[in-house]
C-alpha cells in the first residue's frame, strides 16, 4: 500500500504552544520593611501572545495560530485590482480587493495572482493579502504577534529579505522567521529526514532532506501541478462536447475534486463499459452534465505531462531521478524509505497508490515506501504550526531590533 510508511504522530510540543512573547502586567511594586527596603515582585499577570503561521500558496494563503492542528483561514491568493478607467473622479474605494471583498462587486476588476509557479512576482499583491489577513480575517494587530512565513524551494534568497522588509517595515511585527516549505512539510510527518514530493496548485518539487537540512543541489522542480490538471480537465471536457472557458475554472476545479481520480491501471479503466464510469454533475445553473473517461484521464498528465503539452518528466520519473542523484551522497536508502507526499494535488483519489506503483517500477531495487498523510493538503502550514510551538525554536525568531541593527545578515543567520 502507498501508506505502508505511516506518518508519525505529531507528538506534544515543548513549552506553551505558539507562545511568541508575553506582556507583563503593571502590578509589580516595592515594599518598605522599615529596616531595609527590599524589592518584592508580585506575581505578574501575563498575557500570552500566540505566533501567527502564514503559508502563501499559488491558490490559497493558509494562516492561523501556531499550536493549532490545521489553519483557521484559507484566503484566495488571487486579488482583484480596480480598472483605472472604471474609477470616477473622487472615487475613494479600495484599489485592491482580497478575499470576500471580491464577492458581490459590480466594479470591473483585473484579477491578479502574485505567484507564478510558486515564486512571488508581485509583492504589492502579497502586501495586500497580508493586510487582509491581519486586519480583516484574523482581526489582530500585527505589531503584537511574531510571524512564521514559509518560502518555496529554490526561491531566490532575496525573497527572505523582502519578507522581512514587509513584515518589519510595513506591519511592524516584533519578530519573524522564514523557512523552507519542504522542511515544514517533513515536520508535519514527525520526521527530519526523507524525500518530500510536493505538488500544490502552481508548481511541483521533489526535495531531499537529511536531518533537517534541505539539499537544494539535489532538488527537482516541475512547472506543472493542480492548476494545470484543472486546465487539462477543461480541455478534455470541451473535446467531449462541452463549452467551458476560463471563466468556468472554479467549476472545473470543483468537478476535479468531486468526480476525478487517478487510476491504478488506466488501461483497465479504458476497458470498462461507459456506464461503469459515467457520473452526473449538476452545474450552478441546474444543468446536468455527464462525465466519463475524463474522470481518470485528466490525472494521467501528472504521470505523462506531454498529454498537456509539457516536455518535463512525470512526477514519478522526477522522483526516481532525484533518488538516483542521492546515490552519490549516500542518502539514497534513507530517502527511498521515506517518500512523503505533500500538497493539494496529491489528494486526488487513488494518487498515492498509483504513485507508489509507478515509482516501484522505476526503482525496482530500492523498495521505495510512499507515505500519504490524511492532512497533507496543509502539510506546510501544519509543520509551521509545530515548529513555532517548540521551546527550542524560540531562539530562532529574528526580532525587529536585530533586523534594524544587522539587516539581511540577521535573516540569514537564523533562517
UniProtKB/Swiss-Prot annotation:
This is Actin-like protein 7B. It is found in: Cytoplasm, Cytoskeleton. SUPFAM superfamilies: Actin-like ATPase domain (SSF53067). Residues 1-35 are annotated as: Disordered. Pfam families: Actin. It comes from the Eukaryota. InterPro entries: Actin (IPR004000), ATPase_NBD (IPR043129). SMART domains: ACTIN (SM00268). Belongs to the actin family. Its main location: cytoplasm. Keywords: Cytoplasm, Cytoskeleton, Phosphoprotein. The keyword Cytoplasm applies. One of its GO terms (cellular component) is cytoskeleton. It comes from Macaca fascicularis (Crab-eating macaque). The modification Phosphoserine is found at residue 6.
Amino acid at each position: 500500500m502507498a501508506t505502508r510508511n505511516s506518518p508519525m504522530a505529531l507528538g506534544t510540543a515543548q513549552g506553551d504552544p505558539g507562545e511568541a512573547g508575553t506582556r507583563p502586567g503593571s502590578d509589580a511594586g516595592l515594599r518598605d520593611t522599615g529596616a531595609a527596603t527590599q524589592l518584592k515582585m508580585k506575581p505578574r499577570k501575563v498575557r500570552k501572545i500566540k505566533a501567527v503561521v502564514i503559508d502563501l500558496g499559488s491558490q490559497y494563503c493558509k494562516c492561523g495560530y501556531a499550536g493549532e492542528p490545521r489553519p483557521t483561514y484559507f484566503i484566495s491568493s488571487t486579488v482583484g485590482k480596480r480598472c483605472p478607467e472604471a474609477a470616477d473622479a473622487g472615487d475613494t474605494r479600495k484599489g485592491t480587493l482580497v478575499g470576500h471583498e471580491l464577492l458581490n462587486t459590480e466594479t470591473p476588476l483585473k484579477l491578479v495572482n502574485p505567484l507564478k509557479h510558486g515564486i512571488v512576482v508581485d509583492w504589492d499583491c502579497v502586501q495586500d493579502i497580508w493586510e487582509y489577513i491581519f486586519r480583516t480575517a484574523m482581526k489582530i494587530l500585527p505589531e503584537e504577534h511574531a510571524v512564521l512565513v514559509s518560502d518555496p524551494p529554490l526561491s531566490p534568497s532575496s525573497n527572505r529579505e523582502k519578507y522581512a522588509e514587509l513584515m518589519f517595515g510595513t506591519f511592524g511585527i516584533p519578530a519573524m522567521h522564514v523557512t523552507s516549505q519542504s522542511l515544514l512539510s517533513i515536520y508535519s510527518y514527525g520526521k527530519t529526514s526523507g524525500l518530500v514530493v510536493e505538488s500544490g496548485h502552481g508548481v511541483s518539487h521533489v526535495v531531499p532532506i537529511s536531518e533537517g537540512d534541505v539539499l537544494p543541489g539535489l532538488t527537482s522542480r516541475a512547472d506543472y501541478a493542480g492548476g494545470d490538471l484543472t486546465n487539462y480537465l477543461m480541455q478534455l471536457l470541451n473535446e467531449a462536447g462541452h463549452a467551458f472557458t476560463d471563466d468556468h475554472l472554479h467549476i472545473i476545479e470543483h468537478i476535479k475534486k468531486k468526480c476525478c481520480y487517478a487510476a491504478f491501471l488506466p488501461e483497465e479503466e479504458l476497458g470498462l463499459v461507459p456506464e461503469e464510469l459515467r457520473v452526473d454533475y449538476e452545474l450552478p445553473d441546474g444543468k446536468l452534465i455527464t462525465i466519463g473517461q475524463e474522470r481518470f484521464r485528466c490525472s494521467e498528465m501528472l504521470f505523462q505531462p506531454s498529454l498537456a503539452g509539457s516536455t518535463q518528466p512525470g512526477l514519478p520519473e522526477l522522483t526516481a531521478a532525484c533518488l538516483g542523484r542521492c546515490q552519490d551522497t549516500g542518502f539514497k536508502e534513507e530517502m527511498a524509505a521515506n517518500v512523503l507526499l505533500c500538497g493539494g494535488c496529491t489528494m486526488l483519489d487513488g494518487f498515492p497508490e498509483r504513485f507508489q506503483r509507478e515509482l516501484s517500477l522505476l526503482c525496482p531495487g530500492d523498495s521505495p515506501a510512499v507515505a500519504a498523510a490524511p492532512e497533507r493538503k496543509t502539510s506546510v502550514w501544519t509543520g509551521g504550526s509545530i515548529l513555532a510551538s517548540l521551546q527550542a525554536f524560540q531562539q530562532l525568531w529574528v526580532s525587529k531590533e536585530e533586523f534594524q541593527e544587522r539587516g539581511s545578515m540577521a535573516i540569514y543567520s537564523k533562517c
